[in-house]
Amino acid sequence: MTRPVTLSEPHFSQHTLNKYASLMAQGNGYLGLRASHEEDYTRQTRGMYLAGLYHRAGKGEINELVNLPDVVGMEIAINGEVFSLSHEAWQRELDFASGELRRNVVWRTSNGSGYTIASRRFVSADQLPLIALEITITPLDADASVLISTGIDATQTNHGRQHLDETQVRVFGQHLMQGSYTTQDGRSDVAISCCCKVSGDVQQCYTAKERRLLQHTSAQLHAGETMTLQKLVWIDWRDDRQAALDEWGSASLRQLEMCAQQSYDQLLAASTENWRQWWQKRRITVNGGEAHDQQALDYALYHLRIMTPAHDERSSIAAKGLTGEGYKGHVFWDTEVFLLPFHLFSDPTVARSLLRYRWHNLPGAQEKARRNGWQGALFPWESARSGEEETPEFAAINIRTGLRQKVASAQAEHHLVADIAWAVIQYWQTTGDESFIAHEGMALLLETAKFWISRAVRVNDRLEIHDVIGPDEYTEHVNNNAYTSYMARYNVQQALNIARQFGCSDDAFIHRAEMFLKELWMPEIQPDGVLPQDDSFMAKPAINLAKYKAAAGKQTILLDYSRAEVNEMQILKQADVVMLNYMLPEQFSAASCLANLQFYEPRTIHDSSLSKAIHGIVAARCGLLTQSYQFWREGTEIDLGADPHSCDDGIHAAATGAIWLGAIQGFAGVSVRDGELHLNPALPEQWQQLSFPLFWQGCELQVTLDAQRIAIRTSAPVSLRLNGQLITVAEESVFCLGDFILPFNGTATKHQEDE
């Protein structure tokens, strides 16, 4: 395996402080650390977050991911002048292979003296609570007096909202300090322990004032002499209170002391080895194209790891991962649809954990359904740790009218329920995990199916699904949204299949499910192949969207039109019917997929970061490789592009997952259809070769393909469909793609053969 690449920050700019703090964030799924600088800047947002640690700041506030006390900040004073701002030379990079962030700066003070300041840090991959930092200072041309102040700064807030009360701060011996904090509702405790080790002849003292516990280290350096400070941090949190606070804090301190017996480099080596093993089983390599393409793939996989709480099935992946406070750290449908597939095909145990998060929160979903007059489980549109609905009731206030508009998503964007069921079936078909599907999976499928059965309304002699919002959030409160109806039917059908297969004794459910499937009316494909998005969409006027599409992601349409006006036009925020074609490819012919893509894409602004990748995958399945690659590239630039504020409040986690989706499900053509693994590869002309690992039903596959051939190596014999034809691979096989001609652009092969 070649080594993953690095991400470099080309130059220092205060305009991109928070963008790169997100892009270069570090973590391990347990905690996330923004790549803020050691020195302070007014516009800089520091951030450190623990997966699952949410708190509500007060009445009327929403549960949000808690921004912890800062441990990165360091005030560096050289000859009394505080280090900040201007730099003579600059280099900062994040090494995806090891997760280490490195910075080298040459700084000159006001009197012209020069200093090299080098810092590096990592969040441990093998000891989840551990962060290690190192900074070195070297005078270049004159002696210097150096003072470094660093420790635990508990003045950090979530944009002014304080979640933690300081319980206790202590200093132990000459090198150890600890701060203990409790959420203001008294339910969770956080212990942050620090150890600072400094080389050379130094003087040290401590201060504790205004929620800051700091160690101050001073040294006199000659020109060319280097001062090195290594800082280790151990962060524990709990919400069970099984041990006394002092006992629990002491245990945390002992863990730090054990780490302190090793150097920074020794700790880094262990973490890097953990990363190496992880990359070995997951890295995607591409030959050809621009260097950006490989970097984007490495970037995506790196962040997919650090955002995922693989250690804790009571937590899931937030819309911004653990890189910022956007969306308050809440979990959306993004997790099941855009993020879970990566884990499903690389480490199914993680996918199982993410689904068990939903299973643990079934009671809250059942209660939400009950409160709204339905049966089964209605999962919250936004969730945190408890499983309760966390979507704000109102959006931002209109400063001209003084009115707030209700947030409609939690009221009607119910497709999330079927999305979770879809993910359960994807997991079941990919792994064959009977213990899961017979217990947690069955519960999720039955309860979500019961919701749809009760959610449908009778119109004459048929059932319909009314007052919903599909993935296109610019079209609200419509009847018979195609995505919602098709996914609801799929949900109920799969629940019925599993109930029968595993001997469910609920005869009443089976009868109701059968009647639902028989009577549910489904939006019908028109003679031109287009599936209407809902009952009213086709009757609405279309407008020229060119200027809005040019500013995709900015929602500039809402500067010219109200939401109510947008709702009455053929304007899509993101893929809707095209999203359905992606989710259930076996149910649609290639001709229909192509017709939908050609009809809906010109009407789609792509104001959601979720949109372009899905269009790209469907375009690839339709053989439109130039368009598909363009969508994929534009999707990679949602965060990595030139916009200086593209991800100030955290990366777009789903768009990051979609980079993997586009390469594997788009260009490699990987999909699961009716319980079978399909590969329908079609590389863009920019790529000469694509190689990737894949997990399927207990087998580890390595797939390498180019324009003419596909090589598959497997750990055990496996059957799959290559361009629709069933093949069996044992050990390693090479196939000429010319021998596997794919009918009409590669979608719904079985259906086309039937037709």
Swiss-Prot record:
The active site is at E473 (proton donor). Gene3D superfamilies: 1.50.10.10, Glycoside hydrolase, family 65, N-terminal domain, Maltose phosphorylase, domain 3. The keyword Glycosyltransferase applies. Substrate binds at W333, D334, K573, Q574. InterPro entries: 6-hairpin_glycosidase_sf, 6hp_glycosidase-like_sf, Gal_mutarotase_sf_dom, Glyco_hydro_65_C, Glyco_hydro_65_M, Glyco_hydro_65_N, Glyco_hydro_65_N_sf, Malt_Pase/Glycosyl_Hdrlase. One of its GO terms (biological process) is carbohydrate metabolic process. It holds the Pfam family Glyco_hydro_65m. Keywords: Carbohydrate metabolism, Glycosyltransferase, Transferase. It catalyses: kojibiose + phosphate = beta-D-glucose 1-phosphate + D-glucose. One of its GO terms (molecular function) is carbohydrate binding. Disruption phenotype: No visible phenotype when grown on glucose. Its EC number is 2.4.1.230. In vitro catalyzes the phosphorolysis of D-kojibiose into beta-D-glucose 1-phosphate and D-glucose. No other disaccharides tested substitute for D-kojibiose. In the reverse direction disaccharides can be formed from beta-D-glucose 1-phosphate plus D-glucose, L-sorbose, D-sorbitol, L-iditol or 1,5-anhydro-D-glucitol, but with low efficiency. The beta-D-glucose 1-phosphate product is the substrate for YcjU (AC P77366), the next apparent enzyme in the putative biochemical pathway encoded in this locus (yjcM to ycjW). Kojibiose does not support bacterial growth of K12 / BW25113 nor of BL-21(DE3), perhaps because it is not transported into E.coli. Belongs to the glycosyl hydrolase 65 family. This is Kojibiose phosphorylase. It comes from Escherichia coli (strain K12).
